[in-house]
Curated annotation (Swiss-Prot):
Keywords: ATP-binding, Cytoplasm, DNA replication, DNA-binding, Lipid-binding, Nucleotide-binding. Plays an essential role in the initiation and regulation of chromosomal replication. ATP-DnaA binds to the origin of replication (oriC) to initiate formation of the DNA replication initiation complex once per cell cycle. Binds the DnaA box (a 9 base pair repeat at the origin) and separates the double-stranded (ds)DNA. Forms a right-handed helical filament on oriC DNA; dsDNA binds to the exterior of the filament while single-stranded (ss)DNA is stabiized in the filament's interior. This is Chromosomal replication initiator protein DnaA. The gene is dnaA. Residues 125-341 are annotated as: Domain III, AAA+ region. Its main location: cytoplasm.
């Protein structure tokens, strides 16, 4: 059977879709064509449902256009393609190889080597208590969690490298350890190295001092998965970047998994060599955003349950509405509430929480105000605050105004009418429309999603 129908679809979709969307949703699909039925196999139910929801119409259109003389029936399934003659894999050319075709080539397994001295991690230092099961999933981290899960199931083949970025305390480190635990669950003898980027720097410095660079290289290039947190700390360390560049290449050539995290998008990391930043984007790059209200409530309820505390819904919502910046802050606040309750023997009510977190809540209220949001958005988009309050409707002003309204709804306790009044006396329906519009744009447009995340980080810092 001719496999060109799916290859033609892939070529068009790769041109039409942003690289991140193509890598996340289309590239993992495997195709089998039998008796005019094209079956696309997704690696899991999450990917299958997403492709059906977002891309099935376009795929059918392409099949109709390209195969008008030989119509194909499209169906989906979860799993791997059968190993039969008429199967076909996705093999579009990577946009970012830069002519280095060998980067993704199959390589023979690296020979086992002696590990360096005790300053180098041993078999693994993955934290067993950070798993996918206790990672609270929401819209803000759904894609990153799904990609990390796929990597754990298929290390070295699904999204390599995986680059996860976002503000402090949003769950990036949790996902790194969850991947490590997932890999070890399937392959107990796998060699997993997790570390903060500064540990890599320290290991290299010690290796240089002890004339042990060869041992250092052997260890880091023999791991099955290298998980490095806060890669932005490589900035300005040219010797470290040079060594990591070669380590990175060696791992990918050997189909060994690399996962990196950062507090910002790869191209925004100053002080890191451009060729490294380019390689960071070779696989899949995903953001973790501050958790939305429902996820914050779920995190609080889960944490309370782990502490054998029955946290009432109204109390969880009260805390979640007042503390919005990150998971770490939420958990720290809850620990403080629980400790106060244990010391005093009092029940955890809204009044008790208000008392226990008095200084924290007061600080939060001072930090995020509509005035502060307007000033921050105006500076970010290089417009005047007066423009946000004006009746001007051109996009260069209207879009920042909508974003500022959406941020005001998310980050303050003001009502829609109050927000509208603060933006030049607008009606509450205008604010509601702005919030819905920005939500839609964040799902569809990478630039808007980036802008919104950057603004939240600025306002929450």
């Amino acid at each position: 059977m001719d496999h060109s129908p799916w290859q033609r679809c892939l070529s068009v979709l790769q041109e039409e879709l942003p690289a991140q969307q193509f890598s996340m949703w289309i590239r993992p699909l495997q195709c089998v064509i039998n008796d005019n039925v094209m079956t696309l196999y997704a690696p899991n139910r999450f990917v299958l449902d997403w492709v059906r929801d977002k891309y099935v119409n376009r795929i059918n259109e392409l099949l109709t256009i390209n195969e008008s003389n030989n119509p194909l029936l499209l169906r989906f399934d979860v799993g791997s393609k059968p190993t039969i003659d008429n199967s076909v894999t996705n093999s579009p050319v990577s946009r970012n190889t830069g002519g280095n075709e060998s980067l993704f080539a199959k390589a023979t397994s690296a020979p086992k080597v002696a590990e360096p001295e005790s300053n180098i991690p041993k078999k693994t230092n993955v934290r067993l208590n950070y798993t996918f099961e206790n990672f609270v999933e929401g819209k803000s981290n759904q894609l990153a969690r799904a990609a990390a899960s796929q990597v754990a199931d298929n290390p070295g083949t699904a999204y390599n490298p995986l680059f996860i970025y976002g503000g402090t305390g949003l769950g990036k480190t949790h996902l790194l350890h969850a991947v490590g635990n997932g890999i070890l669950l399937n392959k107990p003898n796998a060699k997993i190295a997790y570390m903060h980027s500064e540990r890599f720097v320290q290991d290299m410095v010690r290796a240089l001092q002890n004339n042990a660079m060869e041992k250092f290289k052997q260890y880091y290039r023999s791991v099955d998965a290298l998980l490095i947190d806060d890669i932005q700390f490589f900035a300005g360390k040219e010797r470290t970047q040079e060594e990591f560049f070669h380590t990175f290449n060696a791992l990918l050539e050997g189909n060994q998994q690399v996962i990196l995290t950062s507090d910002r998008y790869p191209k925004e990391i100053n002080g890191v060599d451009d060729r490294l930043k380019s390689r960071f984007g070779w696989g899949l790059t995903l953001a973790i955003e501050p958790p939305e209200l429902e996820t914050r409530v779920a995190i609080l309820k889960r944490k309370a349950q782990e502490s054998q505390i029955n946290l009432a819904d109204e109390v969880a919502f009260f805390i979640a509405k007042r503390l919005r910046s990150n998971v770490r802050e939420l958990e720290g606040a809850l620990n403080r509430v629980i400790a106060n309750a244990n010391f005093t023997g009092r029940a955890i009510t809204i009044d008790f929480v208000r008392e226990a977190l008095r200084d924290l809540l007061a600080l939060q209220d001072k930090l995020v105000t509509i005035d502060n949001i307007q000033r921050t958005v105006a500076e970010y988009y290089k417009i005047k605050i007066a423009d946000l309050l004006s009746k001007r409707r051109n996009r260069s002003v209207a879009r920042p105004r909508q974003i500022a309204m959406a941020l005001s709804k998310e980050l303050t306790n003001h009502s829609l009418p109050e927000i509208g009044d603060a933006f030049g006396g607008r009606d509450h329906t205008t604010v509601l429309h702005a919030c819905r519009k920005v939500k839609s744009l964040r799902e569809e447009t990478h630039d808007i999603k980036e802008d919104y995340s950057n603004l939240i980080r600025t306002l929450s810092s």
